[in-house]
Amino acid sequence: MTELKNELIRHSAADLAAKLASREVTAVEVTQAHLDRIADVDGQVNAFLHVNSEEALAVAAEVDAARAAGGSAAEELHALAGVPIAVKDLIVTIGQPTTAGSKILEGWHSPYDATVVKKLRAAKMPILGKTNLDEFAMGSSTEHSAYGPTRNPWDLDRIPGGSGGGSAAAVAAFEAPLALGTDTGGSIRQPGAVTGTVGVKPTYGAVSRYGAIAMASSLDQIGPVSRTVLDSALLQEVIGGHDPFDSTSLTDPFNDLVAAARVGNVAGMKIGIVKELHGEGYQAGVENRFNESLQLLKDAGAEIVEVSCPNLKYALGAYYLIMPSEVSSNLAKFDGVRFGMRVLPKDGPMTIERVMGATRAAGFGDEVKRRIILGTYALSAGYYDAYYGSAQKVRTLIQRDFDAAFAKADVLISPTAPTTAFKLGEKLDDPLAMYLNDVATIPANLAGIPGLSLPGGLADEDGLPVGIQLLAPARQDARLYRVGAVLESILEEKWGGPILAQAPDLKTAVLGAVSTTAGGSN
């Protein structure tokens, strides 16, 4: 049985779906295998903030009962019914706490489900639990979580990326075949790059944001985390579609993603190298894997062209004015009055202003406070036009740069992150160094275009995963899945299998970490 469980957790979501449909395995067996894996390794990885065993197994049992009954009950099941999934703890769920990685929401339970969660429930996908993140999704390493950092399954002393390091680590550690994340400046794609997983930021508005606790509303986007490009396509088709509860939701159906992932060729497609998104400042091992991917795509029949987006050099600066400005506004609701923690001032008059001040001082971490201060300043009278207004003008220029680039290429390509995963604590006291991790991912959020990161191999210097990023015009998410699936297939042929097959045995790593800790305490 142990061998069966170990085999089950390593299957892709698509493979699990096929095995479930043929009744080769049961949904309860699949779900229990992943719950057992969480119990075995998550004490060291810390990918999950909450595990929902009882509900997940109950949903799995419903799926098994429907398949056993046959007839219409079985026919009406979604293709992914019974395939378990993890959800980033920024997305609200009935019956489970939603903390946003913050002390200010510790123990809070939402009275409603996010739209994407409703869709998971409708598809009867067992929700394993809620994953760790940087507080309110503000960070690039998951070290800013109030509940401790998540560790990278490739090396437990390294970061798993952020803000959605919990979702990426859960998938990389085989604790879940699929996960949901949110991406405001790279929070799905950058963790994907450093953990060897696939992360997708859909077109802005392609997936409803209703029920995702807002960080920066004009930038936030929910998207899939998986181990294969096809799995991400399958999940995006589940969670996508128009939602009247989200005023920015698109009416486009986006129902051609799985078909695109199965096309199997890139012959005749033009793939543009973004001049400003590689080269100086990028780790040599990252550049080497990037150049290999370019050659492989060229060998597969794609035409490689170079494009320039000159205003991308201003993207980081514009982002760190727009994003904190929206953070300042969105986080004003967390005041200790209606929900979340409440801290009373120790002395003096008990006014609502003083209660709010005491609550926010105690409930928010340093990074959240830093961004609220930056945003409040940027929006203040006398500075609005100089900072926020100017940043929005730069955003328009970046959008125009992408329009021009896509007139020359079907898809753009770059490294996802400038380096591989760095050591825990290495950049925690240097905000600028931390912010630079998202230099290649931020532009897609500013422009509202879709982006996909897939594993591009291992860096020569440290043997850690490198991510390759693909970008497409708005509403053309299918192009990402077509090119991504082909590149993934070619790379896996080169490696002799999926990149995660080369990851260290996590159980051995965990046992080693436990032994080291025990030895150090003597």
Swiss-Prot record:
<keyword id="KW-0436">Ligase</keyword>
<dbReference type="GO" id="GO:0005524">
    <property type="term" value="F:ATP binding"/>
</dbReference>
<keyword id="KW-0648">Protein biosynthesis</keyword>
<dbReference type="GO" id="GO:0050567">
    <property type="term" value="F:glutaminyl-tRNA synthase (glutamine-hydrolyzing) activity"/>
</dbReference>
<dbReference type="Pfam" id="PF01425">
    <property type="entry name" value="Amidase"/>
</dbReference>
<keyword id="KW-0547">Nucleotide-binding</keyword>
<keyword id="KW-0067">ATP-binding</keyword>
<dbReference type="InterPro" id="IPR036928">
    <property type="entry name" value="AS_sf"/>
</dbReference>
<comment type="similarity">
    <text>Belongs to the amidase family. GatA subfamily.</text>
</comment>
<comment type="function">
    <text>Allows the formation of correctly charged Gln-tRNA(Gln) through the transamidation of misacylated Glu-tRNA(Gln) in organisms which lack glutaminyl-tRNA synthetase. The reaction takes place in the presence of glutamine and ATP through an activated gamma-phospho-Glu-tRNA(Gln).</text>
</comment>
<dbReference type="GO" id="GO:0006412">
    <property type="term" value="P:translation"/>
</dbReference>
<comment type="subunit">
    <text>Heterotrimer of A, B and C subunits.</text>
</comment>
<dbReference type="InterPro" id="IPR000120">
    <property type="entry name" value="Amidase"/>
</dbReference>
<dbReference type="InterPro" id="IPR004412">
    <property type="entry name" value="GatA"/>
</dbReference>
<dbReference type="GO" id="GO:0030956">
    <property type="term" value="C:glutamyl-tRNA(Gln) amidotransferase complex"/>
</dbReference>
<protein>
    <recommendedName>
        <fullName>Glutamyl-tRNA(Gln) amidotransferase subunit A</fullName>
        <ecNumber>6.3.5.7</ecNumber>
    </recommendedName>
</protein>
<feature type="active site" description="Charge relay system">
    <location>
        <position position="163"/>
    </location>
</feature>
<feature type="active site" description="Acyl-ester intermediate">
    <location>
        <position position="187"/>
    </location>
</feature>
<dbReference type="InterPro" id="IPR020556">
    <property type="entry name" value="Amidase_CS"/>
</dbReference>
<feature type="active site" description="Charge relay system">
    <location>
        <position position="88"/>
    </location>
</feature>
<dbReference type="InterPro" id="IPR023631">
    <property type="entry name" value="Amidase_dom"/>
</dbReference>
